[in-house]
């Protein structure tokens, strides 16, 4: 008799996605991050759901409701900090997942890649709106500064900002709508993840060599399911240590002060995972130019499949491109550091140099390196 998992309409989908899925035999731990992101999303939805049961999205009570969760709700403190630090783990996994895709040329599966870029935008939007909800000083001023960037759009900018705010400043209406969107977006993200996996399973996974692996496939379970469980344990350990020992390590102390529209914090900055984009935004003196650079810093990922000039897929056997890739990583770390510094010399100059280098590597140097490597191999 055929196993029920191979015949049942629903179990068959699960079977073909997670059990009998043919996977390349050479996948390294860099392929763990997709499943880790799934776990992160699950943790965020679960903790977020329980937080939403006690949170009130009203500007008069939001800050106090978060304090109430931490002090009075059973294990509310662990829910709150697991949710806040879970977002950090989510972004660490996201950036490593994208980095893996860039290094091994996974972006040549353009449908999967472009759904992934949309997912990145959706997760960033969700995280931004979530940061506003505790209604502390940095929440309020972060929301004010970032939404105000839309006023740089010619002609409709000011009207658009006031439409998003629901008034003439960030206030009660803004908080309520941000909570509504923050609640619903993770479910939209879950649907997009299914589309992401659908496109991935049309082509099968890439592998470290970048060479088609149709001749050498192994079943996902037990080989990669066991490998993924090790990743889960390591990530959950890291999240637990962060949540239980230093829950405020990655947060901003200003957010423990209730939002005050009359008092601006000395340094307005977003959470650490947005600092690289914030540094690019600040490095351009013109408002519209800065906003365009901010959007393009992420949107540039969408055109990477068009910029692939090499005859090889992976960077594994391309030393010049590999050097540029690690230069890009170092550059992003530099931008992250600059984003957290005050706007003064020499940080402005370093930020501008790093921003120019960021776009130069992706748009100019990497494609040229691909052409050069083809020439060196006489291809």
From Swiss-Prot:
Note: Heme 1 (or BL or b562) is low-potential and absorbs at about 562 nm, and heme 2 (or BH or b566) is high-potential and absorbs at about 566 nm.
Claim: rRNA processing is one of the keywords in the record: no
PROSITE patterns according to UniProt: CYTB_CTER (PS51003), CYTB_NTER (PS51002)
Gene3D superfamilies per UniProt: Cytochrome Bc1 Complex, Chain C
Transmembrane segments: 33-53, 77-98, 113-133, 178-198, 226-246, 288-308, 320-340, 347-367
Function: Component of the ubiquinol-cytochrome c reductase complex (complex III or cytochrome b-c1 complex) that is part of the mitochondrial respiratory chain. The b-c1 complex mediates electron transfer from ubiquinol to cytochrome c. Contributes to the generation of a proton gradient across the mitochondrial membrane that is then used for ATP synthesis.
Entry similarity comment: Belongs to the cytochrome b family.
Record's bilayer topology term: Multi-pass membrane protein
Lineage top rank: taxon: Eukaryota
Annotated positions binding a ubiquinone: 201
Name of this protein: Cytochrome b
UniProt keyword terms in alphabetical order: Electron transport, Heme, Iron, Membrane, Metal-binding, Mitochondrion, Mitochondrion inner membrane, Respiratory chain, Transmembrane, Transmembrane helix, Transport, Ubiquinone
Cofactor: heme b
Organism per entry: Thyroptera tricolor
Gene Ontology annotations of biological process type: mitochondrial electron transport, ubiquinol to cytochrome c
GO CC list: mitochondrial inner membrane; respiratory chain complex III
One GO molecular-function entry: metal ion binding
Residues in the signal sequence: none
Self-association state and partner proteins as the record states: The cytochrome bc1 complex contains 11 subunits: 3 respiratory subunits (MT-CYB, CYC1 and UQCRFS1), 2 core proteins (UQCRC1 and UQCRC2) and 6 low-molecular weight proteins (UQCRH/QCR6, UQCRB/QCR7, UQCRQ/QCR8, UQCR10/QCR9, UQCR11/QCR10 and a cleavage product of UQCRFS1). This cytochrome bc1 complex then forms a dimer.
Amino-acid positions noted as binding heme b b566 in the UniProt annotation, renumbered to this chain: 97, 196
Subcellular location: Mitochondrion inner membrane
Cofactor notes: Binds 2 heme b groups non-covalently.
Annotated heme b b562 binding sites: 83, 182
